[in-house]
Curated annotation (Swiss-Prot):
This is DNA-directed DNA polymerase. GO terms for molecular function: DNA binding; DNA-directed DNA polymerase activity. It catalyses: DNA(n) + a 2'-deoxyribonucleoside 5'-triphosphate = DNA(n+1) + diphosphate. Its EC number is 2.7.7.7.
Length: 664
């Protein structure tokens, strides 16, 4: 059935014709080839790439360009006609994929590779997968857009010529991008061929900057990781649909029970699903004497923090009802929406990048960290009572075990590693304290960072942890005191940078002279911070060294050579530089995880997903899980040993210790 009504009158014409299949070139021996797919993908924005997994999701045409050589657009499924023989095109491309050993170039290559694999075109001998939308955020991750057009303009190109395409779309009454599959191929061919040649031209200019910034190490790492992440999405994660059904029933039952108890106590009825409506739950809270503030719209202001602060069974019941409702309506529903034939095909974002649907804005995380979407597998229930039960819906491959291999205290170890290398920057005494920490790890790789620092400082573990995290994340003294549960004070700074309480005589004098008031650590908190800094000086000294480096050059360099950059403020100075240490250890930890994924994949290990500090595998036995852990520990030599905790089970939840019984 045709979806397209040919126009009665046309304002455009095209003399483009598809190439003769018999004249197409061999890719064997080519240094670089660019490739791009035009697709029909109606659910892309809502559910992510379909790649042939969902109905009406398929390639309509494939374009290629050999660097400094021939190329062409090969239409195969255009609704408007002008297609080449489907099997002939696929046979040609499958044959080229088998012999091509150079670099494959493109823009948003994972999207194209996923669709191509659906048609049996798989590039298993490629040297590197060079994606200009990976290269560009490596060169600078601070841009607002990483669309092909924005990247082209940054590198001095006009971008894609869409004039003919858009004019034809107007004649046919369709959207020129999402409905391109409807057009006759003759109106798409020229656009598609230029679309493929452009990344080759952009990449040449990007590579000069990659040379200038010495980014080849991290670019090669990301280029090796790209097909691995594409493979994770293509295969997907198995879902236990029976357990998913059970969890939905359990969550509905628990929500109903909680709301029934609220009614029993307060006399106010709240329907299932209404627990998120402030105006509905407000009467129950007011019944127990809670005075509620109003929003600017005049509605009761009831958020998570408020419910958590109320010491009363009704608040506890409402909070529980919200949690189990979210489990059912957000998490379970998202799995059902995205699941295809019992598997979830989520997208793993390597870097900040343009969204697959080419809409405004970007997807992905900064500083090299992986993120995921459609659905977000990195944002699953983790600390709730039902977290293990929920994660039990995620299964390994048939007949295998789920192995959760989790880096233990990855970022604190990275901080010790860098402090050991920074003697000239942090000073001899601070360096000695770092060496002391390093040696403790070398003597016992199971050393707990926060307890070690507590012992070194002679303070409680909880306090040592909060201070370490505060220094690592660039917190000020006042914020750290609030984290520690200690009082702060309003202070002013004297001429020699001394702090004075605003209520002291000197403080009042400085205020009268116009000194700026600000919140600072109180005496008790400051004494604790001073003790930590005196006994474990390398953390603060390293933080100051990172801040100084960021202020001077505008970036921090991580383990792989990645540059984590800082924006400039209105005065032209680098901003947020107090986050320098955080960028260093977060970015380097991300590098370590990515290096481990590449090394594990090259060793033939079967990665399922990556979440935070964890890489999950489908393994035959504990020996295989231990092999993966060994690679994770040793793929990046550090000044101290890395630790990887290994747990296996019949599902993700079972690997966490779930006993198979729902919470009461």
């Amino acid at each position: 059935m045709s979806y397209l009504q040919p126009p009665l009158f046309t304002t455009v014409s095209s003399d483009w014709v598809a190439p003769d299949l018999s004249t197409l070139p061999s890719w064997e021996g080519a240094k670089r080839v660019a490739i791009d797919c035009e697709t029909r993908d109606p659910d892309l924005r809502k559910l992510g790439p379909g790649a042939g997994r969902r109905p009406n999701s398929y390639i309509t045409g494939i374009s290629f360009a050999i660097e400094d050589g021939p190329g062409g657009y090969l239409p195969i499924r255009h609704e408007g006609g002008g297609n080449l023989p489907l099997e002939g095109v696929l046979a040609y491309l499958r044959a080229q994929a088998k012999v091509f050993t150079g670099d494959l170039v493109g823009a948003n290559l994972p999207y194209d590779l996923d669709f191509l694999a659906g048609d049996g075109i798989e590039f298993e001998r490629v040297r590197y997968f060079r994606d200009i939308q990976i290269a560009d955020p490596l060169i600078c991750e601070l841009h607002d857009s990483y669309s092909m057009q924005a990247i082209a303009e940054r590198w001095g190109f006009h971008g894609k010529d869409e004039a003919l395409l858009r004019a034809a779309a107007v004649d046919y009454g369709i959207d020129p991008k999402k409905d391109m599959w409807m057009l006759p191929a003759k109106f798409v061919g020229k656009y598609a061929e230029e679309d493929t040649r452009l990344p080759l031209n952009i990449l040449r200019r990007q590579e000069r900057e990659i040379d200038e910034q010495d980014l080849w190490g991290v670019y090669n790492l990301e280029s090796k990781l790209l097909p691995i992440l594409t493979g994770l999405r293509r295969r997907g994660v198995r879902i236990d649909c029976d357990r998913l059904d059970m969890i939905e029933r359990w969550a509905l039952e628990k929500e109903t029970e909680a709301l029934a108890q609220v009614r029993s106590i307060t006399g106010h009825r709240i329907a299932v699903g209404d627990v998120w409506k402030p105006e509905v739950i407000a009467p129950a809270l007011e019944h127990i004497g809670i005075k509620l503030n109003k929003t600017s719209q005049g509605k009761p202001n009831i958020d998570k923090e408020l419910l958590g602060s109320i010491d009363h069974p009704v608040a506890d019941l409402l909070e529980r009802a919200r949690k189990v409702n979210k489990l059912r309506t957000t998490f379970a529903s998202s799995v059902r929406d995205h699941m295809v034939n019992g598997r979830l095909h989520g997208t793993f974002n390597q870097l900040r990048r343009q969204k697959d649907d080419e809409s405004d804005g970007t997807a992905g995380a900064a500083y090299g960290r992986l993120s995921s979407e459609h659905p977000n597998l990195q944002q699953q229930p983790a600390r709730d009572e039902f977290a293990m039960m929920w994660r039990a819906i995620y299964l390994p491959e048939e007949g295998q075990h789920w192995a959760s291999n989790d880096y233990s205290q990855q970022e604190p170890r990275m901080a010790v590693h860098y402090a050991c290398l920074a003697k000239d920057l942090i000073g001899h005494q601070a360096w000695l304290s770092a060496i002391e920490a390093r040696d403790k790890y070398r003597n016992d790789p199971n050393t707990d960072n926060h307890q070690m620092m507590a012992d070194m400082a002679g303070i409680k573990r909880k306090d040592a942890k909060e201070i370490y995290l505060g220094l690592s994340y660039g917190m000020g003294g006042a914020k750290m005191c609030r984290k520690l549960g200690l009082p702060t004070m309003m202070a002013v700074r004297g001429p020699r940078f001394q702090l004075f309480d605003v209520n002291s005589p000197e403080g009042q004098r400085l205020v009268a002279e116009g000194a700026r008031r600000f919140e600072a650590a109180g005496p008790e908190g400051q004494a604790l911070l001073d003790t930590f800094d005196h006994k474990v000086p390398f953390i603060k000294k390293l933080a100051k060294a990172c801040e100084a480096r960021a202020k001077a050059v505008g970036y921090i360099t991580t383990l792989s050579g990645r540059r984590c950059r800082f924006p400039k403020d209105k005065d032209g100075n680098y901003d947020w530089t107090h986050k320098g240490l955080n960028r260093l250890i977060q970015g380097s930890s991300a590098d370590q995880t990515k290096m481990a994924m590449v090394a594990c994949a090259e060793a033939g290990l079967d990665i399922i997903i990556q979440v935070h500090d964890e890489i999950a595998f489908s393994v035959h036995d504990m020996k295989e899980a231990a092999e993966a852990a060994h690679i994770m520990r040793t793929c990046t030599p550090l000044e101290l040993p890395s630790k990887v905790d290994v747990e296996i089970g019949q599902s993700w939840g079972h690997s966490m210790g779930w006993d198979g019984n729902p919470p009461s």
